[in-house]
Curated annotation (Swiss-Prot):
It catalyses: (sulfur carrier)-H + L-cysteine = (sulfur carrier)-SH + L-alanine. This is Probable cysteine desulfurase. InterPro entries: Aminotrans_V_dom, Cys_dSase_SufS, Cysteine_dSase, PyrdxlP-dep_Trfase, PyrdxlP-dep_Trfase_major, PyrdxlP-dep_Trfase_small. The modification N6-(pyridoxal phosphate)lysine is found at K229. Its cofactor is pyridoxal 5'-phosphate. Pfam families: Aminotran_5 (PF00266). It comes from Staphylococcus aureus (strain COL). NCBIfam families: sufS (TIGR01979). One of its GO terms (molecular function) is cysteine desulfurase activity. Gene3D superfamilies: Aspartate Aminotransferase, domain 1, Type I PLP-dependent aspartate aminotransferase-like (Major domain). Catalyzes the removal of elemental sulfur and selenium atoms from L-cysteine, L-cystine, L-selenocysteine, and L-selenocystine to produce L-alanine. The lineage of its organism: Bacteria, Bacillati, Bacillota, Bacilli, Bacillales. Belongs to the class-V pyridoxal-phosphate-dependent aminotransferase family. Csd subfamily. Its EC number is 2.8.1.7.
Amino acid sequence: MAEHSFDVNEVIKDFPILDQKVNGKRLAYLDSTATSQTPVQVLNVLEDYYKRYNSNVHRGVHTLGSLATDGYENARETVRRFINAKYFEEIIFTRGTTASINLVAHSYGDANVEEGDEIVVTEMEHHANIVPWQQLAKRKNATLKFIPMTADGELNIEDIKQTINDKTKIVAIAHISNVLGTINDVKTIAEIAHQHGAIISVDGAQAAPHMKLDMQEMNADFYSFSGHKMLGPTGIGVLFGKRELLQKMEPIEFGGDMIDFVSKYDATWADLPTKFEAGTPLIAQAIGLAEAIRYLERIGFDAIHKYEQELTIYAYEQMSAIEGIEIYGPPKDRRAGVITFNLQDVHPHDVATAVDTEGVAVRAGHHCAQPLMKWLNVSSTARASFYIYNTKEDVDQLINALKQTKEFFSYEF
């Protein structure tokens, strides 16, 4: 395998939160799938905004207002370029992936789904990409259908073709599973959806932090992701939507900035993208997200992918060697940097608590994916996930902690 081309030790220096001990041990943060850490470069632009040009945007003619507007709209352009969208109007800033998906479900879904229509999802989805479509189906008396998964938690092209048909109006799918690490072929699924006149809405929360995105090549109709999973601030997300679709959609939130004209009994809406950004927007957060994107681009997504793949394969092999561990999802060379597992006869929450005493942060629970837990025939799992600031030393620390946990819970008192 080709060597990655960045110095992880130099990267780690950019993350002050990692320079600490937890329970007397060096911190090994293996929970970036839930929330990533934030480099000083992003912290600095946030501080600079609040220190130098904190102001509201768009209508202010004073200097601070102009600087804030420039920062906010330049952030939009950074996102547009990052995902290779055609038009700046196609970039809507939201509170996060969940808000983005709900916007599509309510605005596009309510206007285009009718009784008897079908909405297609998978059992690997995060609740944020199941519940909005459940509720839409209930409101419209439509049918929610699930693409079957293979034994490894992947999608088979023939199953996709059999599930999507001329009744399908919306296909909603995760680009990468937050539990299994499955990487779905969004481009192919989009082609199949479009052949039947359906649109595709992609949950990209786990993909945007780790891979280069190209909306032209992928041909997704909607694509959603969050800043806090890709080194950015919390509270900021992005909805990409094709301009011709967004132009026909009605806003679902109303108030300041999103209006064109308001009379006593009626109102008209601003042009894209403003009509979907009611109220004071997420100014500092958008500026921080743009800096996070620039940080990742300086490292390079090819290098990021290679490094994460090396680390994931190493962790997978080391974990597989521990007797009593069950790992869920695709093989080690066909998954993103996520390993979800259970340790025999030890509850996942006990696993997470035990390894935390050794300074290792992993996630435990159903990971907002209860239908997937039912499919796996478990109530919950533990999950380790990897990012650009993780090392083999972090993995070794996890492995040692898991071995100690196994030994402790095997001890007969």
